[in-house]
Structure formats: C-alpha cells, structure tokens
C-alpha cells in the first residue's frame, strides 16, 4: 500500500526523514510550559505557571503570500519561515499579547526532506526571536495541487495578555502622537505588485545589484520580516501605549485606521523618517503614485504606536538609548482616514 501511495506521488518515508531533520530546530524553541515533544496528535502547553489575574488568549494566523515565489526562484528557504512567524506574531503583539506558542502548516508538491527542514529552521528561528515555542505543525505532500518545487506556508500563534492591559485603541484621542518603528524592508506584503514590476515591467535580474541598493535585488527582496515581540514587551512594561498598528497588507492607508476609534484619523508628516531605498527603487521602476505606495507597502515603518503627547519624547529617547530607532511620524486628528502633510511626496 505504501508503495502504491509513493507511486501516486506521496512519499511517506520522505516525510519521516523531514521530521527527523527538523527536530533539532524545533527543540531550540521549547519553553518550560511545553509538555511532551513533537509527534503527538496535538501540542500541549501548560498555562498554570503563568502569573495572570484575568488572562486573555490572543490568537492570529497568516501566511507569507507570494514572497514564496522569490524563495522558489532563488532556491533559498531558510528564512521564509521567519516571515511566517513575524506575520502572525506582530498581529497579536500590537494588542498587547505575549506570544506563547506557534504551529506551522506546509503544503508542498513534493516533500524534499532537506527543503522542509530548511523551512522549519526559519520558523524555529522566528519563534526564538519572538519568544514562543513551536509545539506542532503539519507537512502535507499534495501532488497535483502544487508543482514539485513549490509549497505554501502558513502559521498560527497563540499569545496571552492581562485583560486590563490589552491595547485596544479605545483611549486614543485627537492630539495623540504617532511613533513609527522601522521595518527591515518590504516585510511580507505587496509581492504580487513587486513581481509584476520586476519581471514584467522592468525585466530585472534578481542576481544584480541596482542603484540605490547595496545587495543583489533578490537578497533585498528576501530580507526577513522584523519581529517586534520582545521590543514591545519592554516598551509596554515602561510606557502606556494607547494603540498599535502592524503595517502589513494595505500599508498605512488600511492599517493605521484599524487602531482608531470612530471619528478619528491621522495626519502623517512626510520626511519624518528615512524611507528605505527599496521603496524608492520600486516606485521609480513601477511608475507608482505616492498614494499607491502607501496603500501597498510599509514604506520603511513596520509598526505604528499611538501615545499621549507627554509620552512621545521620553519613549523615543528610551528607544534611542536601547539602540532602537524610532520616529515621531504624525498625529491623531479629528476626522477619518490617513492624510499627509509637509515636505515633498515620499
């Protein structure tokens, strides 16, 4: 029967080998609360030792999107898992949660053990960076659904927060200040547009270094998404943060309003932070308008915090002392949506 299954395109032995190879990576993510190891029907996590009066579990799920296509083209698979963790974890930490555990899902056309292990290594590296345990996952070999050299990657994270310390945005008011934390690059959104610009419009090579970039284009595009979990935990332990927005799909235009109460908008100050060269490069090659850039990309800001005016300067100063750049990028105003003021167009 196993032989027949292999002839149908599913190699069970390859799956076993992949699990054996990934165990070393999974092990480094373990926390004391994890019960048992991988391989069970479900992952176990003991909450009893955590010191919360009114604990609230906060969950998130996401994938990497078409950034995967570039990993396929470059045959580089050891960092794409970091992106998967980041996309999930950043969504829950902006609500004040501490990530506890993570699960991944890999669907592929052909299970190549070394490739699967490389993907999981990235997931494990992301979990270590976020402080959460990788307690389970699924690798599904699906011939006929995916090409042999392609796969999809998704993840699921659960975190915890004290109910009274959830960051909900409800206390945000006009006059509050917006602080931006830098991104590492494109992060994990906008890649369908990126691929269209690079391959169809500009017909560029992933192996070439183009001005103003300082690394090959492919390397720039595969830079892992920044994970903000540990930094935000330190921030939340010292400062009152009224609201936070993870700048992902939809850019500034869609994501910043998600943290605002009804009747409020934001005014962004152009030129108040350094826009990374990759964004200027893509805008020029794709002939894109400012509004579209801010509707698709993070433009060099991966996370936005809303704080009271008296908190803004001390927070930026403290972050600077931690060698963590931060920028006052705008303010909350009466109205709705996102507007821009000052300087030249980004």
Curated annotation (Swiss-Prot):
Keyword Nucleotide-binding: yes
InterPro entries found in the cross-reference section: PurM-like_C_dom (IPR010918), PurM-like_C_sf (IPR036676), PurM-like_N (IPR016188), PurM-like_N_sf (IPR036921), PurM_cligase (IPR004733)
Principal location class: cytoplasm
GO molecular function, one term: phosphoribosylformylglycinamidine cyclo-ligase activity
Top-level taxon of the source organism: Bacteria
Pathway annotation: Purine metabolism; IMP biosynthesis via de novo pathway; 5-amino-1-(5-phospho-D-ribosyl)imidazole from N(2)-formyl-N(1)-(5-phospho-D-ribosyl)glycinamide: step 2/2
Alphabetized SUPFAM superfamilies for the sequence: PurM C-terminal domain-like (SSF56042), PurM N-terminal domain-like (SSF55326)
GO biological process: 'de novo' IMP biosynthetic process; adenine biosynthetic process
Record-linked Pfam families: AIRS, AIRS_C
Annotated Gene Ontology cellular component terms: cytosol
Keyword Glycosyltransferase: no
Reactions this protein catalyses: 2-formamido-N(1)-(5-O-phospho-beta-D-ribosyl)acetamidine + ATP = 5-amino-1-(5-phospho-beta-D-ribosyl)imidazole + ADP + phosphate + H(+)
Keywords: ATP-binding, Cytoplasm, Ligase, Nucleotide-binding, Purine biosynthesis
Subcellular location(s) of the protein: Cytoplasm
E.C. numbers: 6.3.3.1
Protein family: Belongs to the AIR synthase family.
UniProt-listed NCBIfam families: purM (TIGR00878)
Name of this protein: Phosphoribosylformylglycinamidine cyclo-ligase
Organism: Geobacillus thermodenitrificans (strain NG80-2)
